[in-house]
């Protein structure tokens, strides 16, 4: 392959399109300074992929576009096309001619083409990689590059040798692999972060989903058992309710009948009482009749005696009466005449008295001034006298009233005394009955006290047993709960182990089909075990390889892989025992690690496994070290040169090379590695708990039977006690009634004492009052007598007034005397008139009585015999009536006694009926309350079915049948509710959420496995490339070093030169030092040589590289500028010598170089800022040289 042509337009100073055709051999490009000849080199470098504007002697990529001149506008495009002959297929492309084009626009856009086909810059770089023709290759040495090679650091100088060794593609691939590794690690980190986050979700969600499923199962079971039990309870309760309702209905009917009987009895008692009252009233009436009859009989007897006496004096009385009648008639006539006369005289006297009174009034007015005081006193005394006179009359009337009241009080006292005697007898009877009741009550009370003591003792024992039972039952339910939890955990672990939960999908499917596939030993983590404290470290050390599947051989692995592909089950990594070889620490490193205090052991030594799997375990864990902590891991890694992977107990990792991985490790409830151990522990604990639970069940059963026996005994004691209490209540009721009756009688007796006392006190007060009134009457009489004397005294005093009044007084006196006389006469006449009238009236009355007596006497005398007989007959009749009345009273009293006995019987019967009625009513109320509670309970149960399960009783009974004993069912319901309560808050959405998150977790786990495998593969690739680069670099370096000394001697005409590695132990990073000893000088570093010597040494290095690694073409830009003529000549000869194998394009202005050139191109700048290329013939070149 060789360079055929370069086409340029718009690149730097090439404003117009130029084409440079290259031939084999040496092509020289010449021109004055500043003409733009080095732009040819820049154009080639740029089209081969250079991206640094500074390497192209610009500030930014826009600077390579023609910027214009005084006469030309700037261009907006720079384009370079490089055409190469590829007949020998030096370039890895199936074309005989390859053209590479690169364009850049002022807008910043770029275009890349290979054979006019758009491509990427990366494609161009890859095309020339490790061909020696790249942008950084030793085949293109621009201005200053020689000096840069000589003066650069030994490490930077290494790139020339790497290019020569052809390791750039490996280096690039390594870089890509490292980038891919970093990208993979980033992806792995992201996946692990997401997995870490998902692990924080998956495990809780898994637990929540398991709890939710458990909850739904328990809820379903609870629903079935509870509905069936509720339906059973409803049916049982309804049967009891129906029976009780019939009983209550019968009791109501009995109550109604007894109520009617009580009403009838009360009516009979009321009727009897009415009859007794009627008899009492009848006796009272008969006694009144008896009294009247007795009185009439006594009158008749008296009249009989009077008749006998009158009969004796009848004649004598008749004569006397006749004489008296005559006298009375005569007297009547005389009195009538006198009365007529006297009335006329009285009228005359009245007129005179009236006249005298008028005169007296006149005189009194005249005398009033003289005797006013005396008159007033007299008048006052008269007023007092009249008041005393009124008081005297009032006192006499009150004395009469007191006499009447004292008579009435005596009658009342006698009646009260009779009643009191009766009440005393009744109280005596009641006291006897009361004493008997009290004795009976005390006996029952003692018996009740004994029963209560026995009941309390039994109750205490019962409560102790009940507390012990409840305690044991609570412990049993707790044990059930623990057993249930342990069994659930065991089932979960067995299910997870059976389902290979937590394994990658591909691994899981292989393990499930392990028997069918054959040759499958199991996943790595299934084949090992370790102590719990090492589990985290071992899991981290294994990483994804923990789920690698161990097979007998490669054929088994291929069969499993084919199975995964056919069923699209994912991927898995297999470890055939037939090919896996163990790895282990070097003995020296093992000894070094053992001496470190933090070192715990090699991972393979900390796990237990079958010796058959030693190669696999040693391969995976034989070079992994386990330490206490990260600090110790760092120290140990440094001691071992960061060649091994070190894991701490907390899961932190120090990787080979020094990188570190660490942070928080999520604590899993059951890791894959520790699952078997945990299952074994749970199984052991479950067996122990089940044994303890069985013992508790037996204890609870025994206690329950004991409690039931005690409950029966307590019920018997309660029943006996209730019977005694009812009997006691009955006696207490009787005692209460007797106490009430006794209290009533005592009240009557107290009332009698009070009434008697009150009456006695009233009589005594009346007597006192009477004596006082008599004394007052005597005092009033004395006062009246005194007042009369005072009036007489004052009257006499008034008569002894002074002489000035005497005349008037005499006149007045005379007038008064005359008036008094007239008045006295008038009074006398009036009295006479009244006397005559009275006497006339009395005479008329006496005359009438005398006539009547005479008529009666005459009648009696004429019928004395018949009258006496009539009276005798009347007396007999009255006596007969009296006898009948007495007999009738006795009969009524006998009837009353009989009725009273009947009433007492009725009342006792009524009392017993009421007592029994009250008991039945109380029982009926209790039964009704119980019935009401049953109805409420039935309604609650039916409502519970409707509201909780939307079921009717018929639907529940039809769909759900009670399959066990009701008590067992209740126990089961309680256990299920306890289990549900123990589950706490249940997230039912966790089931779907777990499926979603777990699916993603599985997918990402597979991604992690793939990324881990890719990471391991990349590590392996990098390791392989490191080995290849080390080998290639070392081989190439040795060859170049050998040729360098030879070429140096040839160019310098002697001396010697040497290439040295700065770090022979690190061929991947070691720098290269150039040591030169020109002829006649000491061996010394390049920095101590002259400029020419340095340039010639660099040229010697270039030719040494070309000897080892020939390239199709080489571009040299004034590399010999610093050489003298002799060295330029030697340089030109070497160019010519090597031009048979390598095409040289030389940018130069040295004659010796030009002389050896096959073709010359000249670059001129005829127009300011614009370069042009012209071809120069060889003859013209020679002339130009001469």
UniProtKB/Swiss-Prot annotation:
What is the name of the gene encoding this protein? Answer: smc
Q: Summarize the record's disruption phenotype note.
A: Mutants produce anucleate cells and show defects in nucleoid structure and in chromosome partitioning.
Spell out the subcellular localization from the entry.
Cytoplasm
Put simply, this protein is called Chromosome partition protein Smc
An example of a GO molecular function for this protein is: ATP binding
The record ties this protein, via CDD domains, to: ABC_SMC_barmotin (cd03278)
Q: Which SMART domains match?
A: SMC_hinge (SM00968)
Q: SUPFAM superfamilies, per this entry?
A: P-loop containing nucleoside triphosphate hydrolases, Smc hinge domain, Tropomyosin
Complex and partners: Homodimer.
NCBIfam families attached here? SMC_prok_B
Q: What does this protein do?
A: Required for chromosome condensation and partitioning.
Keyword Zinc found: no
Q: Where does ATP bind?
A: 32-39
Q: Which UniProt keywords apply?
A: ATP-binding, Coiled coil, Cytoplasm, DNA-binding, Nucleotide-binding
One Pfam match, by short name? SMC_hinge
Q: Name one GO cellular component term.
A: chromosome
**Into which family does the record put it?**
Belongs to the SMC family.
Domain writeup: Contains large globular domains required for ATP hydrolysis at each terminus and a third globular domain forming a flexible SMC hinge near the middle of the molecule. These domains are separated by coiled-coil structures.
Domain SMC hinge positions: 519-637
Coiled-coil-forming residues are 167-206, 259-481, 672-864, 893-943, 990-1029
The organism encoding this protein is Bacillus subtilis (strain 168)
One biological process GO term for this chain? sister chromatid cohesion
């Amino acid at each position: 392959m060789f360079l055929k042509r370069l086409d340029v337009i718009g690149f730097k100073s090439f404003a117009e399109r130029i084409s440079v055709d290259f031939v084999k051999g040496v092509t020289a490009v010449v021109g004055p300074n500043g003409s733009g000849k080095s732009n040819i080199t820049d154009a080639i470098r740029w089209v081969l992929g250079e991206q640094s504007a500074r390497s192209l002697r610009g500030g930014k990529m826009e600077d390579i576009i023609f910027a214009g001149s005084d006469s030309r506008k700037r261009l907006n495009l720079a384009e370079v096309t490089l055409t190469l002959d590829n007949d020998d297929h030096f370039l890895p492309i199936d074309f005989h001619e390859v053209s590479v084009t690169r364009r850049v626009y002022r807008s910043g856009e770029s275009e890349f083409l290979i054979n006019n086909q758009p491509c990427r810059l990366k494609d161009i770089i890859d095309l020339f990689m490790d061909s020696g023709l790249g942008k950084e290759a030793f085949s293109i040495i621009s201005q200053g590059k020689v000096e840069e090679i000589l003066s650069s650091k030994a490490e930077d100088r290494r790139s020339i040798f790497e290019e020569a060794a052809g390791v750039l593609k490996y280096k690039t691939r390594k870089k890509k692999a490292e980038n891919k590794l970093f990208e993979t690690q980033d992806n792995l980190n992201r996946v692990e972060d997401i997995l870490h986050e998902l692990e924080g979700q998956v495990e809780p969600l898994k637990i929540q989903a398991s709890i939710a499923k458990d909850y739904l199962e328990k809820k379903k079971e609870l629903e079935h058992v509870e509905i069936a039990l509720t339906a059973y309870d409803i049916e049982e309760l309804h049967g009891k309710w129906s029976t009780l309702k019939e009983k209550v209905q019968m009791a109501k009917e009995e109550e109604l009948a007894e109520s009617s009987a009580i009403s009838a009895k009360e009516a009979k008692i009321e009727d009897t009482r009415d009859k007794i009252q009627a008899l009492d009233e009848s006796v009272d009436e008969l006694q009144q009749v008896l009294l009247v009859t007795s009185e009439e009989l006594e009158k008749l007897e008296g009249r009989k005696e009077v008749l006998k006496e009158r009969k004796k004096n009848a004649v004598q009385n008749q004569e006397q009466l006749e004489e008296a009648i005559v006298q009375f008639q005569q007297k009547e006539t005389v009195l009538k005449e006198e009365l007529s006369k006297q009335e006329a005289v009285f009228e005359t006297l009245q007129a005179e008295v009236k006249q005298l009174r008028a005169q007296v009034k006149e005189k009194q007015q005249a005398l009033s001034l003289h005797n006013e005081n005396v008159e007033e006193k007299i008048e006052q005394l008269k007023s007092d006298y009249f008041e005393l006179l009124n008081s005297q009359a009032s006192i006499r009337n009150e004395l009469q009233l007191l006499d009447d009241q004292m008579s009435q009080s005596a009658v009342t006292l006698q009646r009260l005394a009779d009643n009191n005697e009766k009440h005393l007898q009744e109280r005596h009877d009641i006291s006897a009955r009361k004493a008997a009741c009290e004795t009976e009550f005390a006996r029952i009370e003692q018996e009740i006290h004994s029963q209560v003591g026995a009941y309390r003792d039994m109750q205490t024992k019962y409560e102790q047993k009940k507390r012990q039972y409840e305690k044991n039952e609570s412990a049993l339910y707790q044990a059930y709960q623990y057993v249930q939890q342990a069994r659930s955990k065991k089932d979960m672990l067995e299910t997870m182990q059976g389902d290979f939960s937590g394994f990658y999908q591909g691994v899981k499917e292989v393990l499930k089909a392990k028997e069918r596939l054959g040759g499958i030993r199991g996943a790595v983590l299934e084949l090992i075990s370790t102590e719990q404290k090492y589990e985290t470290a071992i899991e981290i050390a294994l990483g994804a390889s923990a789920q690698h599947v161990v097979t007998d051989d490669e054929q088994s692995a291929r069969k499993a892989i084919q199975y995964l592909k056919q069923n699209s089950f994912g991927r898995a990594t297999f470890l055939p025992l037939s090919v896996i070889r163990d790895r282990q620490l070097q003995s020296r490193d093992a000894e070094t690690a053992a001496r470190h205090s933090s070192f715990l052991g090699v991972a393979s030594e900390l796990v237990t496994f079958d010796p058959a799997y030693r190669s696999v375990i040693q391969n995976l864990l034989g070079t992994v070290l386990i330490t206490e902590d990260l600090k110790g891991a760092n120290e140990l890694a440094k001691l071992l040169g960061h060649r091994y992977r070190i894991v701490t107990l907390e899961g932190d990792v120090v990787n080979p090379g020094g990188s570190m991985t660490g942070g928080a490790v999520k604590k899993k409830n059951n890791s894959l590695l520790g699952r078997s151990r945990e299952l074994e522990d749970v199984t052991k604990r479950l067996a122990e708990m089940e044994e303890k639970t069985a013992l508790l069940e037996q204890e609870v059963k025994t206690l329950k039977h004991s409690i039931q026996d005690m409950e029966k005994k307590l019920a018997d004691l309660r029943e006996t006690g209730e019977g005694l209490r009812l009997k006691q209540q009955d006696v207490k009721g009787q005692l209460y009634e007797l106490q009430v009756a006794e209290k009533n009688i005592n009240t009557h007796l107290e009332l009698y004492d009070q009434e008697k006392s009150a009456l006695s006190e009233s009589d005594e007060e009346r007597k006192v009052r009477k004596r006082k009134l008599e004394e007052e009457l005597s005092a009033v009489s004395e006062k009246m007598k005194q007042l009369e004397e005072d009036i007489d005294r004052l009257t006499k005093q008034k008569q002894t007034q002074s002489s000035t009044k005497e005349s008037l007084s005499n006149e007045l006196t005379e007038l008064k005397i005359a008036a008094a006389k007239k008045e006295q006469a008038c009074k006398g006449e009036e009295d006479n008139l009244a006397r005559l009238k009275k006497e006339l009236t009395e005479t008329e009355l006496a005359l009438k009585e005398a006539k009547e007596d005479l008529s009666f006497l005459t009648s009696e005398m004429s019928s004395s015999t018949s009258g006496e007989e009539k009276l005798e007959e009347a007396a007999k009749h009255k006596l007969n009536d009296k006898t009948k009345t007495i007999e009738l009273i006795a009969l009524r009293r006998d009837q009353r006694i009989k009725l009273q006995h009947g009433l007492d019987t009725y009342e006792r019967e009524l009392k017993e009926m009421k007592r029994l009625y009250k008991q039945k009513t109380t029982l009926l109320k209790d039964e009704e309350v119980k019935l009401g509670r049953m109805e409420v309970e039935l309604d609650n149960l039916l409502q519970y079915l409707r509201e909780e399960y939307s079921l009717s009783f018929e639907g529940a009974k039809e769909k759900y049948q009670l399959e066990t004993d009701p008590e067992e069912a209740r126990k089961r319901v309680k256990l299920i509710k306890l289990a549900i309560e123990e589950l706490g808050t249940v997230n039912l959405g966790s089931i779907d959420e777990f499926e979603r998150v777990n699916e993603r977790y599985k997918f990402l786990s597979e991604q992690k496995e793939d990324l881990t495998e890719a990471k391991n593969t990349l590590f392996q690739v990098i390791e392989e490339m490191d080995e290849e680069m080390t080998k290639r670099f070392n081989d190439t370096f040795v060859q170049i070093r050998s040729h360098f000394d030879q070429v140096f001697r040839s160019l310098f005409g002697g001396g010697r030169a040497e290439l040295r590695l700065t770090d022979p132990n690190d061929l991947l990073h070691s720098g290269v030092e150039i040591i030169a000893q020109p002829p006649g000088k000491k061996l010394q570093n390049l920095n101590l040589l002259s400029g020419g010597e340095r340039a010639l040494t660099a040229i010697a290095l270039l030719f040494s590289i070309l000897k080892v690694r020939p390239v199709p073409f080489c571009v040299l830009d004034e590399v010999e500028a610093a050489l003298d003529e002799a060295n330029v000549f030697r340089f030109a000869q070497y160019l010519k010598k090597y031009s048979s194998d390598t095409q040289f394009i030389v940018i130069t202005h040295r004659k010796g170089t030009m002389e050896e050139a096959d073709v010359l191109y000249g670059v001129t700048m005829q127009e300011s800022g614009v370069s042009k290329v012209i071809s120069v013939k060889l003859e013209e070149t020679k002339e130009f040289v001469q």
